[in-house]
Amino acid sequence: MSHIDPRHIHISDYNYPLPDERIAKFPIAQRDHSKLLIYNKGEVSSDVFYNLPQYLPKGALMVFNNTKVIQARMHFRKGTGALIEVFLLEPAEPSDYELMFQTTGHCAWYCLVGNLKKWKEGSLRREIEINGQTVVVNATRGELHGTSHRIDFSWGGDVSFAEIIDAMGELPIPPYLNRETQESDKTTYQTVYSKIKGSVAAPTAGLHFTPEVLADLDAHGIQREELTLHVGAGTFKPVKSEEIEGHEMHTEYVSVRRDTIQKLIDHDGCAIAVGTTSVRTLESLYYMGLKVMRDPSLNEDQLHVAQWEPYTGDSPQCESVAALKALLAWMDARSLTVLHSSTQIIIAPGYDYHIVKMLVTNFHQPQSTLLLLVSAFVKGDWHKIYDYALSHDFRFLSYGDSSLLIP
């Protein structure tokens, strides 16, 4: 364990000047023609993203997050004319994502509510057209749940909630783009391999990949695996406290197939992560493995990785393969083919990486937890990387350019 206590890191030490014109408001026309910064053991160079496969070791395992962004912004107009925005955050009833999108007639979500002061009481109502039939959607506000509200939705007809949000929802693009969602975002703000609905923000490192780049990875002998972490709105939550001890990470829900964990074991517990969401999931698997080594009787909910868990010193450290094997044995004892759990892990300087050996990621906001994750990975060399990107005309944030980090 590193001697740094990340709780006392000052977020102001992770600031840098980011002019608005360097924030990519739209993606470039061809995803894989974005620029690629390569950081290799302290040396920095640049290339084009479609050449990524040639920088990766043959036979390596690359892990992608296959979550799909949902049209989470729903608008209702009150009889008074007031516009209320209901932003879906997390399923409440049913709480399972897959069941939620299949459900008909009624469901409940934890949501952020915009223009809340105008919604004192009563239900919101909106008529929409689905497959030629008129469907009336009602929304009723329930109890406060942290900073979000429970919203109960009800509607008529044999229509799933997935169809409801496809018809009336709007794709939530990042707030720092400072523009309205456009029709093109429905395509460009999804990865080409997105499958499992549930995120309210894209795992943007994956936006550069095309079918051609994926085929080229295969041709280079790179093995590919997928996992699912549903990205929450908290990914844009600024760090407002002076020290990061005062910042609470949001809980994110993860699903990992048994086969993927076996593949990680076959690769000596090492992986190339596509994006910070894949990093958080992979590194959380290590701590889940430590938990079941200590107590094999735990259930899935008890595998949740708390924010500061890696830094407490309570967990005996071990090789990543041993932790993954313990997790696999725990799954097999329960005949589980997919692990469903959650993580709140914060990765910051002072963190020792266990599974992720290379990282593909975009350029992140100043003073963000994602920048802390990158700094922990490149052992503080983030200044060198970001100075290079700023001086070589790289585009920043969600629709910006990419980097391959090899510490």
Placement of each model-derived feature along the sequence:
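Surface-exposed, charge/polar-rich loops and edge strands
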Residues: M1-P407
